[in-house]
Curated annotation (Swiss-Prot):
This is UDP-N-acetylenolpyruvoylglucosamine reductase. It is found in: Cytoplasm. The keyword Oxidoreductase applies. Pathway: Cell wall biogenesis; peptidoglycan biosynthesis. Residues 19-189 form the FAD-binding PCMH-type domain. It comes from Pseudomonas syringae pv. syringae (strain B728a).
Protein backbone atom coordinates (compact mmCIF):
# COMPACT_ATOMS: atom_id res chain seq x y z
CA UNK A 1 0.00 0.00 0.00
CA UNK A 2 1.63 3.25 -1.16
CA UNK A 3 -0.95 5.53 0.46
CA UNK A 4 0.48 6.85 3.74
CA UNK A 5 -2.31 7.37 6.28
CA UNK A 6 -1.45 9.50 9.32
CA UNK A 7 -3.41 10.07 12.51
CA UNK A 8 -4.35 13.28 14.34
CA UNK A 9 -2.93 15.74 11.80
CA UNK A 10 -3.50 19.50 12.06
CA UNK A 11 -5.27 20.89 9.01
CA UNK A 12 -4.02 24.43 9.61
CA UNK A 13 -1.49 24.22 6.72
CA UNK A 14 -4.16 22.80 4.44
CA UNK A 15 -6.87 25.49 4.61
CA UNK A 16 -6.33 29.10 3.58
CA UNK A 17 -8.34 30.42 6.53
CA UNK A 18 -5.57 28.98 8.71
CA UNK A 19 -8.10 27.42 11.09
CA UNK A 20 -6.38 24.97 13.41
CA UNK A 21 -8.48 21.81 13.56
CA UNK A 22 -7.38 18.20 13.48
CA UNK A 23 -8.14 15.47 11.00
CA UNK A 24 -8.73 12.07 12.57
CA UNK A 25 -6.85 10.58 9.59
CA UNK A 26 -4.94 12.27 6.77
CA UNK A 27 -3.30 11.19 3.52
CA UNK A 28 -2.09 12.69 0.25
CA UNK A 29 -3.11 11.15 -3.08
CA UNK A 30 -0.46 11.46 -5.78
CA UNK A 31 -2.06 9.10 -8.30
CA UNK A 32 -5.28 7.37 -9.31
CA UNK A 33 -4.10 4.30 -7.42
CA UNK A 34 -3.72 6.38 -4.25
CA UNK A 35 -7.29 7.61 -4.66
CA UNK A 36 -8.58 4.07 -5.04
CA UNK A 37 -6.59 2.99 -1.97
CA UNK A 38 -8.13 5.84 0.01
CA UNK A 39 -11.62 4.73 -1.02
CA UNK A 40 -10.81 1.15 -0.02
CA UNK A 41 -9.35 2.29 3.32
CA UNK A 42 -12.46 4.37 3.98
CA UNK A 43 -14.74 1.40 3.30
CA UNK A 44 -12.59 -1.11 5.17
CA UNK A 45 -12.37 1.01 8.33
CA UNK A 46 -15.88 2.48 8.05
CA UNK A 47 -14.57 6.04 8.19
CA UNK A 48 -15.97 8.88 6.05
CA UNK A 49 -13.80 10.33 3.28
CA UNK A 50 -13.25 14.06 2.77
CA UNK A 51 -11.28 15.08 -0.32
CA UNK A 52 -9.63 18.51 -0.40
CA UNK A 53 -7.47 20.44 -2.84
CA UNK A 54 -5.81 23.72 -1.93
CA UNK A 55 -8.16 24.29 1.00
CA UNK A 56 -9.21 27.68 -0.36
CA UNK A 57 -12.92 26.89 -0.38
CA UNK A 58 -13.24 25.38 3.10
CA UNK A 59 -14.50 26.60 6.44
CA UNK A 60 -13.60 24.02 9.07
CA UNK A 61 -15.78 24.52 12.13
CA UNK A 62 -14.62 21.50 14.16
CA UNK A 63 -12.17 18.61 14.18
CA UNK A 64 -12.80 16.42 11.14
CA UNK A 65 -13.73 12.84 12.05
CA UNK A 66 -12.89 11.56 8.59
CA UNK A 67 -10.05 10.38 6.42
CA UNK A 68 -9.02 13.67 4.83
CA UNK A 69 -7.36 13.09 1.47
CA UNK A 70 -5.49 15.97 -0.11
CA UNK A 71 -5.24 15.71 -3.88
CA UNK A 72 -1.54 16.06 -4.70
CA UNK A 73 -1.41 14.64 -8.24
CA UNK A 74 0.63 16.71 -10.67
CA UNK A 75 1.01 16.85 -14.44
CA UNK A 76 0.20 19.10 -17.40
CA UNK A 77 0.07 17.83 -20.97
CA UNK A 78 -1.29 18.86 -24.38
CA UNK A 79 -3.58 16.07 -25.57
CA UNK A 80 -4.64 17.67 -28.87
CA UNK A 81 -3.60 20.70 -30.87
CA UNK A 82 -3.99 22.37 -34.23
CA UNK A 83 -3.15 25.79 -35.61
CA UNK A 84 -6.03 27.46 -33.77
CA UNK A 85 -6.38 25.75 -30.40
CA UNK A 86 -5.03 23.18 -27.99
CA UNK A 87 -6.67 20.92 -25.46
CA UNK A 88 -4.62 20.93 -22.27
CA UNK A 89 -5.07 18.30 -19.57
CA UNK A 90 -4.04 18.92 -15.96
CA UNK A 91 -4.10 16.65 -12.94
CA UNK A 92 -6.48 17.58 -10.13
CA UNK A 93 -3.72 18.46 -7.66
CA UNK A 94 -2.06 21.07 -9.88
CA UNK A 95 -2.12 24.50 -8.18
CA UNK A 96 -4.42 26.72 -10.21
CA UNK A 97 -2.42 29.92 -10.74
CA UNK A 98 0.84 28.18 -11.75
CA UNK A 99 -1.24 26.13 -14.21
CA UNK A 100 -2.64 29.33 -15.73
CA UNK A 101 0.88 30.72 -16.07
CA UNK A 102 2.11 27.49 -17.68
CA UNK A 103 -0.62 27.73 -20.31
CA UNK A 104 0.26 31.35 -21.06
CA UNK A 105 3.91 30.37 -21.45
CA UNK A 106 2.78 27.76 -24.00
CA UNK A 107 1.17 30.57 -25.99
CA UNK A 108 -2.36 29.52 -25.07
CA UNK A 109 -5.05 32.07 -24.21
CA UNK A 110 -8.34 31.76 -22.36
CA UNK A 111 -7.39 31.43 -18.70
CA UNK A 112 -5.74 34.82 -18.19
CA UNK A 113 -8.79 36.40 -16.52
CA UNK A 114 -8.70 33.61 -13.94
CA UNK A 115 -5.17 34.46 -12.81
CA UNK A 116 -4.24 34.41 -9.13
CA UNK A 117 -7.33 32.51 -8.00
CA UNK A 118 -6.29 30.20 -5.16
CA UNK A 119 -6.95 26.48 -5.17
CA UNK A 120 -6.29 23.56 -7.48
CA UNK A 121 -7.32 22.45 -10.95
CA UNK A 122 -9.59 19.72 -9.60
CA UNK A 123 -11.61 22.13 -7.49
CA UNK A 124 -12.11 24.67 -10.29
CA UNK A 125 -15.00 22.87 -12.07
CA UNK A 126 -16.80 22.16 -8.79
CA UNK A 127 -17.38 25.86 -8.21
CA UNK A 128 -17.27 26.85 -11.88
CA UNK A 129 -14.79 29.46 -10.68
CA UNK A 130 -14.96 32.79 -12.42
CA UNK A 131 -13.54 36.30 -12.39
CA UNK A 132 -13.47 39.41 -14.56
CA UNK A 133 -16.01 38.15 -17.08
CA UNK A 134 -14.75 34.58 -17.57
CA UNK A 135 -15.86 31.30 -15.98
CA UNK A 136 -14.49 27.78 -16.18
CA UNK A 137 -17.37 26.76 -18.44
CA UNK A 138 -16.10 29.19 -21.09
CA UNK A 139 -12.83 27.27 -21.55
CA UNK A 140 -13.87 23.81 -20.39
CA UNK A 141 -13.51 20.77 -22.64
CA UNK A 142 -14.02 17.69 -20.45
CA UNK A 143 -12.88 15.95 -17.28
CA UNK A 144 -12.31 12.51 -15.82
CA UNK A 145 -13.93 11.66 -12.50
CA UNK A 146 -14.04 8.57 -10.33
CA UNK A 147 -17.43 7.28 -9.29
CA UNK A 148 -17.04 6.64 -5.57
CA UNK A 149 -20.04 4.31 -5.60
CA UNK A 150 -18.81 1.95 -8.33
CA UNK A 151 -15.08 2.68 -8.58
CA UNK A 152 -15.44 3.29 -12.32
CA UNK A 153 -14.09 6.23 -14.30
CA UNK A 154 -16.43 8.52 -16.19
CA UNK A 155 -15.77 11.25 -18.74
CA UNK A 156 -17.83 14.44 -18.34
CA UNK A 157 -18.53 16.79 -21.26
CA UNK A 158 -19.44 20.45 -20.88
CA UNK A 159 -23.14 19.58 -20.94
CA UNK A 160 -22.71 16.79 -18.38
CA UNK A 161 -21.29 19.21 -15.80
CA UNK A 162 -24.44 21.38 -15.59
CA UNK A 163 -22.39 24.49 -14.89
CA UNK A 164 -24.12 27.47 -13.31
CA UNK A 165 -23.06 30.52 -11.35
CA UNK A 166 -20.49 29.08 -8.90
CA UNK A 167 -22.24 25.78 -9.39
CA UNK A 168 -21.95 22.38 -11.07
CA UNK A 169 -23.22 18.82 -10.80
CA UNK A 170 -20.13 18.02 -8.69
CA UNK A 171 -21.12 20.51 -6.03
CA UNK A 172 -24.48 18.78 -5.63
CA UNK A 173 -23.07 15.24 -5.82
CA UNK A 174 -19.86 15.81 -3.87
CA UNK A 175 -20.16 12.43 -2.14
CA UNK A 176 -20.22 10.59 -5.46
CA UNK A 177 -17.75 12.14 -7.90
CA UNK A 178 -14.05 12.64 -7.36
CA UNK A 179 -12.39 14.72 -10.08
CA UNK A 180 -9.05 13.28 -11.22
CA UNK A 181 -8.06 15.46 -14.18
CA UNK A 182 -9.52 18.29 -16.23
CA UNK A 183 -9.13 19.31 -19.88
CA UNK A 184 -9.40 22.87 -21.17
CA UNK A 185 -9.88 24.13 -24.73
CA UNK A 186 -7.49 27.05 -25.13
CA UNK A 187 -6.85 29.29 -28.09
CA UNK A 188 -3.68 30.11 -29.98
CA UNK A 189 -5.45 33.24 -31.23
CA UNK A 190 -6.27 35.45 -28.26
CA UNK A 191 -9.85 36.63 -27.79
CA UNK A 192 -9.42 38.87 -24.80
CA UNK A 193 -12.21 39.72 -22.36
CA UNK A 194 -11.70 43.31 -21.25
CA UNK A 195 -15.29 44.19 -20.29
CA UNK A 196 -14.38 44.63 -16.62
CA UNK A 197 -13.62 48.34 -16.20
CA UNK A 198 -10.63 48.19 -13.83
CA UNK A 199 -8.78 45.77 -16.14
CA UNK A 200 -9.13 48.10 -19.14
CA UNK A 201 -8.23 51.06 -16.93
CA UNK A 202 -5.10 49.33 -15.61
CA UNK A 203 -3.94 48.55 -19.14
CA UNK A 204 -4.64 52.13 -20.27
CA UNK A 205 -2.62 53.50 -17.34
CA UNK A 206 0.30 51.39 -18.50
CA UNK A 207 -0.05 52.65 -22.07
CA UNK A 208 -0.94 49.19 -23.38
CA UNK A 209 -3.42 49.60 -26.24
CA UNK A 210 -2.87 46.16 -27.81
CA UNK A 211 -2.63 43.87 -24.79
CA UNK A 212 -1.47 40.27 -24.89
CA UNK A 213 -2.92 37.54 -22.66
CA UNK A 214 0.17 37.98 -20.47
CA UNK A 215 -0.63 41.70 -20.13
CA UNK A 216 -4.18 40.89 -19.05
CA UNK A 217 -2.93 38.31 -16.55
CA UNK A 218 -0.45 40.77 -15.03
CA UNK A 219 -3.10 43.47 -14.78
CA UNK A 220 -5.52 41.12 -13.05
CA UNK A 221 -2.82 39.88 -10.68
CA UNK A 222 -2.09 43.49 -9.71
CA UNK A 223 -5.77 44.29 -9.18
CA UNK A 224 -6.40 41.15 -7.13
CA UNK A 225 -3.29 41.79 -5.01
CA UNK A 226 -4.55 45.27 -4.18
CA UNK A 227 -8.13 44.19 -3.43
CA UNK A 228 -7.69 40.80 -1.80
CA UNK A 229 -5.45 39.78 1.11
CA UNK A 230 -2.78 37.12 0.60
CA UNK A 231 -3.88 33.98 2.52
CA UNK A 232 -0.23 33.36 3.40
CA UNK A 233 -0.29 36.63 5.36
CA UNK A 234 -3.92 36.96 6.46
CA UNK A 235 -6.16 33.89 6.57
CA UNK A 236 -9.10 34.05 4.18
CA UNK A 237 -10.99 32.09 1.52
CA UNK A 238 -11.38 34.88 -1.01
CA UNK A 239 -14.93 35.98 -1.73
CA UNK A 240 -16.99 34.50 1.09
CA UNK A 241 -20.47 35.19 -0.27
CA UNK A 242 -21.92 34.66 -3.72
CA UNK A 243 -23.29 37.68 -5.54
CA UNK A 244 -27.05 37.09 -5.12
CA UNK A 245 -29.34 36.89 -8.13
CA UNK A 246 -32.77 38.34 -7.38
CA UNK A 247 -36.06 39.12 -9.11
CA UNK A 248 -36.21 42.37 -11.06
CA UNK A 249 -39.11 43.52 -8.84
CA UNK A 250 -37.03 43.18 -5.68
CA UNK A 251 -34.15 44.98 -7.37
CA UNK A 252 -36.46 47.88 -8.26
CA UNK A 253 -37.60 48.11 -4.65
CA UNK A 254 -34.03 48.11 -3.34
CA UNK A 255 -32.95 50.69 -5.93
CA UNK A 256 -35.78 52.98 -4.92
CA UNK A 257 -34.55 52.92 -1.33
CA UNK A 258 -30.83 52.74 -2.19
CA UNK A 259 -30.16 54.46 -5.55
CA UNK A 260 -26.48 53.50 -5.44
CA UNK A 261 -27.12 49.75 -5.47
CA UNK A 262 -24.94 47.86 -7.95
CA UNK A 263 -26.90 45.48 -10.19
CA UNK A 264 -26.19 43.51 -13.35
CA UNK A 265 -29.16 42.39 -15.53
CA UNK A 266 -29.17 38.67 -16.37
CA UNK A 267 -30.38 36.95 -19.53
CA UNK A 268 -33.38 35.50 -17.69
CA UNK A 269 -34.62 38.89 -16.53
CA UNK A 270 -33.25 38.63 -13.00
CA UNK A 271 -30.57 40.91 -11.59
CA UNK A 272 -27.25 40.00 -10.00
CA UNK A 273 -26.30 42.20 -7.05
CA UNK A 274 -22.83 42.96 -5.76
CA UNK A 275 -22.80 41.24 -2.36
CA UNK A 276 -19.83 43.36 -1.31
CA UNK A 277 -21.85 46.54 -1.86
CA UNK A 278 -24.68 45.24 0.34
CA UNK A 279 -22.27 44.26 3.12
CA UNK A 280 -20.44 47.58 2.97
CA UNK A 281 -23.69 49.57 2.99
CA UNK A 282 -24.73 47.65 6.10
CA UNK A 283 -21.59 48.85 7.88
CA UNK A 284 -19.67 45.58 8.10
CA UNK A 285 -16.58 46.62 6.15
CA UNK A 286 -13.56 46.50 8.46
CA UNK A 287 -15.58 44.98 11.31
CA UNK A 288 -13.64 42.82 13.75
CA UNK A 289 -14.73 40.58 16.60
CA UNK A 290 -11.68 39.04 18.24
CA UNK A 291 -9.65 37.48 15.44
CA UNK A 292 -12.62 37.05 13.09
CA UNK A 293 -13.34 39.99 10.85
CA UNK A 294 -14.37 41.55 7.55
CA UNK A 295 -11.48 42.80 5.46
CA UNK A 296 -10.91 46.55 5.64
CA UNK A 297 -10.59 46.94 1.87
CA UNK A 298 -12.93 44.25 0.51
CA UNK A 299 -16.13 43.64 2.43
CA UNK A 300 -16.80 40.40 0.55
CA UNK A 301 -13.83 38.77 2.29
CA UNK A 302 -13.92 37.38 5.83
CA UNK A 303 -10.50 37.12 7.47
CA UNK A 304 -8.77 35.31 10.30
CA UNK A 305 -6.43 37.71 12.08
CA UNK A 306 -4.64 34.84 13.76
CA UNK A 307 -6.45 32.55 16.16
CA UNK A 308 -10.08 32.69 15.06
CA UNK A 309 -11.87 29.37 15.14
CA UNK A 310 -14.08 28.12 12.35
CA UNK A 311 -17.09 28.56 14.61
CA UNK A 312 -16.20 32.22 15.24
CA UNK A 313 -15.91 32.86 11.50
CA UNK A 314 -19.17 31.02 10.88
CA UNK A 315 -20.91 33.04 13.60
CA UNK A 316 -19.76 36.27 11.96
CA UNK A 317 -20.98 35.05 8.57
CA UNK A 318 -24.39 34.17 10.00
CA UNK A 319 -24.72 37.61 11.59
CA UNK A 320 -23.95 39.27 8.27
CA UNK A 321 -26.47 37.04 6.47
CA UNK A 322 -29.18 37.91 9.00
CA UNK A 323 -28.46 41.63 8.79
CA UNK A 324 -28.51 41.72 4.98
CA UNK A 325 -31.76 39.74 4.89
CA UNK A 326 -33.39 42.16 7.33
CA UNK A 327 -32.09 45.32 5.61
CA UNK A 328 -32.53 44.40 1.96
CA UNK A 329 -34.66 41.25 1.84
CA UNK A 330 -31.76 39.44 0.15
CA UNK A 331 -30.40 36.05 1.18
CA UNK A 332 -26.61 35.75 0.95
CA UNK A 333 -25.19 32.30 0.25
CA UNK A 334 -21.75 31.28 1.47
CA UNK A 335 -19.22 30.21 -1.16
CA UNK A 336 -16.93 28.03 1.02
CA UNK A 337 -18.00 24.51 1.91
CA UNK A 338 -18.68 24.12 5.63
CA UNK A 339 -17.32 21.15 7.56
Amino acid sequence: MSLQVQSAISLKPFNTFGVDVQARLFAEAHSDDDVREALAYSARHDVPLLVIGGGSNLLLSADVQSLVVRMASRGIRIVHEDCLESIVEAEAGEPWHPFVQSCLELGLAGLENLSLIPGTVGAAPMQNIGAYGVEIKDVFHSLTALDRETGELREFSLQDCAFGYRDSVFKHQVARWLILRVRFKLSRVARLHLEYGPVRQRLDEQGIDRPTPFDVSRAICAIRSEKLPDPAVLGNAGSFFKNPIIAAELYATIKQQHPGVVGYPQDDGQVKLAAGWLIEQAGWKGYRDGDAGVHKLQSLVLVNYGQASGLQLLSLARRIQTDIAERFGVELEMEPNLY
